[in-house]
Design a protein with these regions (language model features):
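Membrane-interfacial helix-loop segments of redox and metal-homeostasis proteins
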Residues: 2-182
Length: 182
């Protein structure tokens, strides 16, 4: 624990104690951008997969697995299949990997220069959706509560800008890149 006496020692040694974050994490909702549209599409696929698995056949959990694996893939590589379709249709991204001056990319790649809050969300949600899809398929349909909740929460997140997981990571010190200052 840092006290007044050893705060100066820690600062002199190059370690700066972090202040506890206050406030809430809210994404930019005054404009529509590529990442928000990807979240809406993922939420629709999650809710459709949950509903079809529940009402028709539990093999529809493959839609949930697809969203989960895609989310993990995006967090690790920066390449998003749905994002690239939207990019080709002219939707502007916020988290696009920066290019050299004057360059124009024909592919959308999310920033992967370092781990930041939004990348953590892609990874955490992707892993949890992937194992949940397998549990839905091979164990019990009760596991559909989780992807249905994630789908509904993602719609709320995309429209209101508020996400429970994002706020938790924000409070833990993850660097936000889509946050508005409150």
């Amino acid at each position: 624990m840092l006290t007044n006496g050893n705060v100066q020692d820690a600062t002199l040694n190059g370690v700066r104690p972090r202040k506890k974050r206050t406030g809430i994490y809210i994404i930019k909702t005054h404009i529509w951008y590529l990442e928000r549209l990807v979240w809406i599409i993922a939420a629709i696929v999650l809710m459709m997969g949950s509903l079809l698995s529940l009402l028709h056949n539990h093999n529809w959990a493959v839609l949930i697995l697809g969203v989960g694996l895609s989310s993990v893939f995006v967090s690790l590589t920066g390449f998003c299949f749905v994002g690239n379709i939207l990019y080709r249709l002219g939707v502007k991204p916020i988290l696009e990997r920066p290019l050299k001056q004057g360059e124009k990319s024909k592919y959308y790649l999310m920033q992967t220069d370092r781990w930041y809050l939004e990348r953590y969300i892609y990874l955490i949600v992707g892993i949890n959706l992937s194992w949940t899809a397998l549990l839905v398929r091979f164990h019990s349909l009760w596991w559909l509560c989780f992807p249905a909740f994630v789908g509904a929460a993602t719609v709320v997140f995309a429209f209101t800008g508020f996400c429970i997981l994002a706020n938790t990571l924000y409070r833990l010190g993850a660097e936000p890149r889509l946050c508005i200052n409150l």
